[in-house]
């Protein structure tokens, strides 16, 4: 049967969803799921009628062949019987005449059983012949049946291919279902035989049928493998069946959950908490202008924005369970007692803060300070004449030391604002007022330098009114005391005002128990190692205590007061220098005494790790922001700087001040900073990053100096901060792109035109303004409109070449590469001047 005939016989509606399977492969386990056939009723009846007619024709043919075979066997059996009878007659004995009459009855009796035996033998032979005939017939019919079955299978396969092509052409999905299990195929075949009404085969043909079935199985497995490869290689036209896909339904809407976010989190962790793919977060952050990767650490604020953008509720959490467990194991339940006030002296630079404190302490600190200005935060405690103790913190007044002043205000009880009577309110005075208000500390104003002729204390009171600092004279609660730090005038009144203010505040603290405080200043001593100035706020700090201080920890090996004397313990409001920490802590860190050194180390390492993660997240964010800004603005010049200073506070102040110097064109980048002398590592880093090295009150060691000389590194030492900032500004100025300006130096009017064989058109001109110089750039103006811009090629006065022609004189001007000069034109001569730029 040809393909065209098969196609013509194809029913109008044919569903080939005959076998549907879902295979779950896990090791060697295979699960088969079968579905019933879906064939149109009319098609099924037609197929059944054809099959029935075919079977009846085959049955009639088999019966006819069996009848012919039986007749032939009967004929052969009859011939054999006659031959046997003839043989018996020939061997009979001779008959005796006397006995011939008596013989018939006896012989008849004897002959009867013999005849029965012959008949039985004939029947047995006939049965055997019929069985043999049927066996031969079935042997002949079996190959024919197999051929018919194969032909029918081939026709069905072609029908399926035609139907599949039509289905694909119509744009419908085709389910391609195959079995991989031998048992499933055998069961499917049995079901087909039962549903189609096939007769059971004879016993003699079972073995061959099974063999044929095994061969069919083998062929089908090979076909399945080929089809599987086609599907894998995307060669198959049909789509993968829906039954082979995962059987779960996609959620209609996204699930909104409560997302707990720590201080830092990776993109993958955030996606896991929100039960979405990481690519969704990356897409969301790209829309927000952030480029991230799946393993990138992002800070808490960014993660919160992303989660809220995706519709989730955010719960922010600080991951400090370890710290809390360490802090809980502290003895702080002792009775509170009255403590000394901590007083911070603040004010504008050069208003006499340190000199005032020197007079109170009977010391001369100001005389030894570089440039006469304070650049470190100092902590001192003094006793008044009536036996009461006051702790003083002296903060720098320079603008660069904002963080130091803020730190001093945070650790203080009372702020003494020093204002010069001759200068009045200055920028750092205003800043000090803001710090005091932010810290919630009451103010006592000391109007200094009243011994000067131009001093005007009342003007200071008037100026401070606009900053909400109202004196008691005007009905406020701020005490104003007129003092002279140089002559000692009003110092006792100032101390009395401080004591009075502290009594109003009723300051108390726990004296017994484990100490806690704040780091005022820290530095690295070459002989003693890391040194931290700690202001004890509660408890008693003893020698040998284990101190957890920011990222550092350690056992207190030694303690000294502000005068350098060794002490064994320090109570509340006492500033002490502590030795024995693992590193230099940051100024402003909280210092806490804990019981277990191992736990203190764990907390310190945990804090360092979290800080690195946060810093990395911020740096990555800054890099991406810089990348986007550079894409839009172009390249920005960078000045790399390495800062080394004597104390942590100075490092912070310098780095902050340098960052504020950055402009849109030049950016100051601090590539390294630290406390202590300049080492070989610092010099190597400077060489690698092409950076300027800045040493503030520190020097380079011998190995560092060798590297600096070999690599020609720019190293600069400073002891005054404003000198450092001024020189960095000068270096930045040198990196600015030069600015050029055009200055008109002369103007000539064309009176006549001459032709020259060498120079072409020569303009006879009269200089009306300034000076005309040869080889300068010029512009040709016609009716006050620039028509050409070029260069002055030749300049002559009569027949002589001249370098310049002054105002009121005639000259001949040749314009380079331009011959269209006309009478009445103006020739404007200018020069380009470079203008110095500054920051």
Swiss-Prot record:
Region listing for G5, in residue ranges: 484-486
Claim: Cytoplasm is one of the keywords in the record: yes
Composition skew (Basic and acidic residues), residue ranges: 1-12, 57-67, 104-167, 185-199, 212-233
Compositionally biased region (Low complexity): 68-90
Gene Ontology molecular function, alphabetical: GTP binding; GTPase activity; guanosine tetraphosphate binding; translation initiation factor activity
Positions of region (Disordered): 1-21, 57-244
Region (G4): 448-451
Binding site for GTP: 347-354, 394-398, 448-451
Entry similarity comment: Belongs to the TRAFAC class translation factor GTPase superfamily. Classic translation factor GTPase family. IF-2 subfamily.
NCBIfam families: IF-2, small_GTP
Name by which UniProt lists this protein: Translation initiation factor IF-2
Gene behind the chain: infB
């Amino acid at each position: 049967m040809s393909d065209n005939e098969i196609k013509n016989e194809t029913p109008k509606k044919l569903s080939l969803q005959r076998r549907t399977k879902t295979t779950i492969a896990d090791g060697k386990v295979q699960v088969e799921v079968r579905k019933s056939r879906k064939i149109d009723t009319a098609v099924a009846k037609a197929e059944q009628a054809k099959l029935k007619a075919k079977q009846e024709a085959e049955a009639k043919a088999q019966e006819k062949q069996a009848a012919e075979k039986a007749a032939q066997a009967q004929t052969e059996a009859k011939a054999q019987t006659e031959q046997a009878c003839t043989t018996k007659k020939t061997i009979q004995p001779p008959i005796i005449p006397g006995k011939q009459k008596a013989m018939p009855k006896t012989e008849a009796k004897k002959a009867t059983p013999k005849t029965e035996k012959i008949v039985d033998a004939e029947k047995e032979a006939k049965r055997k012949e019929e069985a043999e005939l049927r066996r031969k017939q079935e042997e002949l019919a079996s190959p024919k049946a197999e051929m018919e079955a194969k032909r029918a299978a081939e026709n069905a396969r072609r029908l399926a291919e035609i139907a599949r092509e039509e289905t694909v052409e119509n744009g419908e999905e085709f389910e391609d279902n195959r079995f991989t299990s031998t048992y499933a195929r055998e069961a499917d075949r049995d079901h087909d035989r039962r549903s189609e009404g096939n007769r059971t085969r004879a016993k003699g043909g079972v073995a061959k049928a099974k063999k044929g079935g095994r061969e069919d199985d083998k062929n089908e497995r090979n076909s399945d493998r080929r089809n599987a490869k086609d599907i894998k290689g995307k060669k198959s036209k049909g789509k993968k069946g829906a039954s082979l896909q995962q059987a779960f339904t996609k959620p209609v809407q996204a699930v909104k959950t409560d997302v707990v976010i720590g201080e830092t989190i990776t993109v993958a962790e955030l996606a896991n908490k929100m039960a979405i793919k990481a690519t969704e977060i990356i897409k969301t952050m790209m829309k927000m202008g952030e480029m991230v990767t799946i393993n990138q650490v992002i800070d808490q604020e960014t993660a919160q924005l992303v989660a809220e953008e995706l519709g989730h509720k955010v719960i922010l959490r600080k991951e400090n369970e370890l710290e809390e467990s360490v802090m809980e194991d502290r003895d702080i339940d002792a009775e509170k007692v009255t403590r000394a006030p901590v007083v911070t002296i603040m004010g504008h630079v050069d208003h006499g803060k340190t000199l005032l404190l020197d007079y109170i302490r009977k010391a001369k600190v100001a005389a030894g300070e570089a440039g006469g200005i304070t650049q470190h935060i100092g902590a001192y405690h003094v006793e008044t004449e009536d036996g009461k103790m006051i702790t003083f913190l002296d903060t720098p007044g320079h603008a660069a030391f904002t963080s130091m002043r803020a730190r001093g205000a945070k650790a203080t009880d009372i702020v003494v604002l020093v204002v010069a009577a001759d200068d009045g309110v200055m920028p750092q005075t205003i800043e000090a007022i803001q710090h005091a208000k932010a810290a919630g500390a009451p103010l006592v104003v000391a109007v200094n330098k009243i011994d000067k002729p131009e001093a005007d204390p009342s003007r200071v009171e008037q100026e401070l009114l606009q900053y909400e600092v109202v004196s008691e004279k005007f009905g406020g609660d701020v005490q104003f005391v007129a003092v002279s730090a140089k002559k000692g005038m009003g110092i006792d009144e100032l101390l009395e005002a401080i004591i009075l203010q502290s009594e109003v505040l009723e300051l108390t603290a726990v004296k017994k128990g484990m100490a806690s405080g704040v780091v005022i200043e820290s530095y690295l001593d070459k002989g003693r190692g890391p040194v931290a100035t700690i202001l004890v706020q509660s408890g008693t700090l003893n020698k040998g205590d284990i101190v957890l201080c920011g990222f550092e920890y350690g056992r207190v090996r030694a303690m000294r007061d502000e005068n350098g004397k060794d002490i064994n313990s320090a109570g509340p409001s006492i500033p002490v220098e502590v030795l024995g920490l693992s590193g230099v802590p940051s100024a402003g860190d909280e210092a806490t005494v804990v019981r277990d050194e191992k736990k203190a180390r764990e907390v310190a390492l945990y804090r360092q790790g979290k800080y690195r993660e946060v810093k990395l997240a911020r740096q990555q964010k800054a890099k991406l922001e810089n990348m986007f800004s550079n894409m839009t603005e172009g390249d920005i010049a960078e000045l790399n700087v390495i800062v080394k200073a004597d104390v942590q506070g100075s490092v912070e102040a310098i780095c902050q001040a340098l960052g504020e110097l950055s402009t849109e064109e030049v950016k100051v980048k601090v590539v390294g900073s630290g406390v202590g002398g300049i080492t070989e590592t610092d010099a190597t880093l400077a060489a690698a990053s092409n950076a300027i090295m800045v040493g503030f009150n520190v020097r380079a060691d011998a190995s560092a100096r060798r590297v600096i000389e070999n690599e020609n590194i720019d190293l600069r030492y400073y002891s005054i901060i404003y000198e450092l900032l001024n020189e960095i500004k000068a270096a930045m100025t040198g990196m600015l792109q030069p600015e050029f300006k055009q200055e008109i130096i002369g103007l000539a009017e064309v009176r006549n035109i001459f032709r020259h064989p060498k120079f072409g058109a020569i303009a006879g001109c009269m200089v009306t303004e300034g000076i005309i110089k040869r080889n300068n750039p010029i512009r040709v103006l016609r009716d006050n409109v620039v028509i050409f811009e070029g260069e002055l090629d030749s300049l002559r006065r009569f027949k002589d070449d001249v370098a310049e022609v002054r105002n009121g004189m005639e000259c001949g001007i040749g314009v380079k590469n331009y011959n269209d000069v006309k009478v009445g034109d103006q020739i404007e001569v200018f020069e380009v001047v470079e203008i110095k730029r500054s920051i």
